[in-house]
Swiss-Prot record:
GO terms for cellular component: actin filament; cell cortex; clathrin-coated pit; cortical cytoskeleton; cytoplasm; cytoskeleton; cytosol; dendritic spine. It is found in: Cytoplasm, Cytoskeleton; Cell projection, Lamellipodium; Cell projection, Ruffle; Cell projection, Dendrite. Contributes to the organization of the actin cytoskeleton and cell shape. Plays a role in the formation of lamellipodia and in cell migration. Plays a role in the regulation of neuron morphology, axon growth and formation of neuronal growth cones. Through its interaction with CTTNBP2, involved in the regulation of neuronal spine density. Plays a role in focal adhesion assembly and turnover. In complex with ABL1 and MYLK regulates cortical actin-based cytoskeletal rearrangement critical to sphingosine 1-phosphate (S1P)-mediated endothelial cell (EC) barrier enhancement. The modification Phosphothreonine is found at T399, T401, T411. Residues 17-27 have a biased composition (Acidic residues). InterPro entries: Cortactin_SH3, Hs1_Cortactin, SH3-like_dom_sf, SH3_domain. Cortactin repeats lie at residues 80-116, 117-153, 154-190, 191-227, 228-264, 265-301, 302-324. Residues 1-27, 344-419 are annotated as: Disordered. This is Src substrate cortactin. GO terms for molecular function: Arp2/3 complex binding; cadherin binding; profilin binding; proline-rich region binding.
């Protein structure tokens, strides 16, 4: 029971101001009998005892309440009398035309044996004349056949008796009684009727321009016979109603124009004293005109303007005008061309795919460079040893056979040795000018080679052996061949290309370049990405950003 009341705030009104509940009121009357008091048959105010339930009264109350409830439901609820039609559920004006009730009796068609065939196509025995088919005939019908040609009455036909009716005869058809009227000969014609009158002329038919011999032409009068009273106008040669407006007589007096001092300037540009306001020029102003000066910027009301208060009206603001709140980042007009490979695949993914390949390629290039360096150094040492051995053999031969003449070697003969020095100096200058072509080629080779040259020259202590040294150096042809080897090694740039667009490296294994830069030693490792050298860096770059050189 305590669970049912859990969560509800039960408040009991307590009357603290009253007296003790156990005290009896002074005016209390105990009108409860002993039976009622024992069985609780009467309610005592404040005692907690209630009288017993009267079943008959309760049943009557329930019945009354049920009746009132049903009446309210009938009044407020939908009424069956208002609906399809009538008092008991049917309203005739709203009933469906195709809906029928239980009282509807359908008229069934009669059987063939019950049909009254007197009414039908027409008449008493199955035929009604007003409904019979016009093309249907009965047995009493007698067809009228056409008469033979020998039985036809030709007295009524083209016209009249014996085949011709005059009212229907053709106008152009003539009979044998027709008499044609022939035209008279010229000798039989009456020429008293014709052009006019009795003797060949009808006056009403005569040509107006045709005149006879009785015609008398009226000649024009001479100037001396003319009456000049009628002419330009009036009695003596002038008729005023026919006179030219521009023609003036001797009595005309020209009205001279008034002097400026005599003119009335009250009528003019407008109004009294020279100005008429309705004719005044809109751009003409008088001395009483006061020009309204524009206010200073400090006096102008900037609450009205481009829009709203403080200079901006939103409804009048230019759509293309931006305010100070609209901050746009300044960007260059140059737009980078994004290749298809860069859109479909990112550089980070390609870096992950080709990272190991790039490392292996770099290691392979490093191994190749070291192998070439070792091979070149070994070849140089071998050549130096051969040159040193030849020098020693020549020195021994010269010591064993001294020269007969004291001056077999003049100083002039040493002059050809100078081109050798010049060639060596030019060779070193050429090497220093060319410089390293790729990042993988080592530079210490040239310094070691120079040291070898210096070591070889220091070993040549004898003055007479100088020419032999240069001759032996020129004889095997080592240095020119080595020069061509360096040219081929440094000039072998591999596949080269020219940059069409600028590209910024997105990773450590990529290279950056600007338009018209040259990329050398290109390796086409993929269709979309190549690898090469540019600006001293070796790495990946997009293939569609460059153009191969022929």
């Amino acid at each position: 029971m305590w669970k049912a009341s859990a969560g509800h705030a039960v408040s009991i009104a307590q009357d603290d101001a009253g007296a003790d509940d156990w005290e009896t009121d002074p005016d209390f009357v105990n009108d409860v009998s002993e039976k009622e008091q024992r069985w609780g048959a009467k309610t005592v105010q404040g005692s907690g005892h209630q009288e017993h339930i009267n079943i008959h009264k309760l049943r009557e109350n329930v019945f009354q309440e049920h009746q009132t409830l049903k009446e309210k439901e009938l009044e407020t609820g939908p009424k069956a009398s208002h609906g399809y039609g009538g008092k008991f559920g049917v309203e005739q004006d709203r009933m469906d035309k195709s809906a029928v009730g239980h009282e509807y009796q359908s008229k069934l068609s009669k059987h063939c044996s019950q049909v009254d065939s007197v009414r039908g196509f027409g008449g008493k025995f199955g035929v009604q004349m007003d409904r019979v088919d016009q093309s249907a005939v009965g047995f009493e019908y007698q067809g009228k056949t056409e008469k033979h040609a020998s039985q036809k009455d030709y007295s009524s036909g083209f016209g009249g008796k014996y085949g011709v009716q005059a009212d229907r005869v053709d106008k152009s058809a003539v009979g044998f009684d027709y008499q044609g009227k022939t035209e008279k000969h010229e000798s039989q014609r009456d020429y008293s009727k014709g052009f006019g009158g009795k003797y060949g002329i009808d006056k009403d038919k005569v040509d107006k321009s045709a005149v006879g011999f009785e015609y008398q032409g009226k000649t024009e009068k001479h100037e001396s016979q003319k009456d000049y009273v009628k002419g330009f106008g009036g009695k003596f040669g002038v008729q005023t109603d026919r006179q030219d407006k521009c023609a003036l007589g001797w009595d005309h007096q020209e009205k001279l124009q008034l002097h400026e001092s005599q003119k009335d300037y009250k009528t003019g540009f407008g109004g009294k004293f020279g100005v008429q306001s309705e004719r005044q020029d809109s751009a003409a102003v008088g001395f009483d005109y006061k020009e309204k000066l524009a206010k200073h910027e400090s006096q102008q009301d900037y609450s009205k303007g481009f829009g709203g208060k403080y200079g901006v009206q939103k409804d009048r603001m230019d759509k293309n005008a931006s305010t100070f709140e609209d901050v746009t980042q300044v960007s260059s007009a140059y737009q980078k061309t994004v290749p298809v490979e860069a859109v479909t695949s990112k550089t980070s993914n390609i870096r992950a795919n080709f990272e190991n390949l790039a490392k292996e390629k770099e290691q392979e290039d490093r191994r190749k460079a070291e192998a070439e360096r070792a091979q070149r150094m070994a070849k140089e040492r071998q050549e130096q040893e051969e040159a040193r051995r030849k020098l020693e053999e020549q020195a021994r031969a010269k010591t064993q056979t001294p020269p007969v003449s004291p001056a077999p070697q003049p100083t002039e003969e040493r002059l050809p040795s100078s081109p050798v020095y010049e060639d060596a100096a030019s060779f070193k200058a050429e090497l220093s000018y060319r410089g390293p072509v790729s990042g993988t080629e080592p530079e210490p080779v040239y310094s070691m080679e120079a040291a070898d040259y210096r070591e070889a020259s220091s070993q040549q202590g004898l003055a007479y052996a100088t020419e032999a040294v240069y001759e032996s150096a020129e004889a095997p042809g080592h240095y020119p061949a080595e020069d061509s080897t360096y040219d081929e090694y440094e000039n072998d740039l591999g596949i080269t290309a020219v940059a069409l667009y600028d590209y910024q490296a997105a990773g450590d294994d990529e290279i950056s370049f600007d338009p018209d830069d040259i990329i050398t030693n290109i390796e086409m490792i993929d269709d979309g990405w190549w690898r090469g050298v540019c600006k001293g860096r070796y790495g990946l770059f997009p293939a569609n950003y460059v153009e191969l050189r022929q």
